[in-house]
């Protein structure tokens, strides 16, 4: 099916992608979905990470091919978003996705590399950015640039804490699981300014 987000000048490595309120995936998210369907490798830095099941499965499939790495925040001005992301760690870790939490400071960067394509711009990798928020992203398809960006992500991961699956499982109490599940639901439907006020007190996310 033709969609303007998926059809462009093939001679140009640059594509501007727009997202906005839609009943389905926004145009920029449709391009990401299209690229993830056949992705061999995925590397991502995201301030907010709470996508739906379909996107999670695509990332996990890439992990089975050549690999998938996620660099996510350990600290945030919106602790509910940190809790929402942590709810998803288990299924991803079981499928071979590497996850690290950035330690030096709060993480606001949005950066995604899928094979030879780099996405940079305003969009997080959560339900609001995929379906609702007005977003502007630039997609750059260049193998050398993608390799350089992956090197940058690797250096940032050196400043981060690698999430170990066994330790992650031990740290999940029933209360923690409930808090994370509620956070995931809230950040998917409520504006970020609202979820900031609804934060569960989590000193690790401050």
What are these regions (language model features)?
Residues 1-206:
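Charged, low-complexity intrinsically disordered terminal segments
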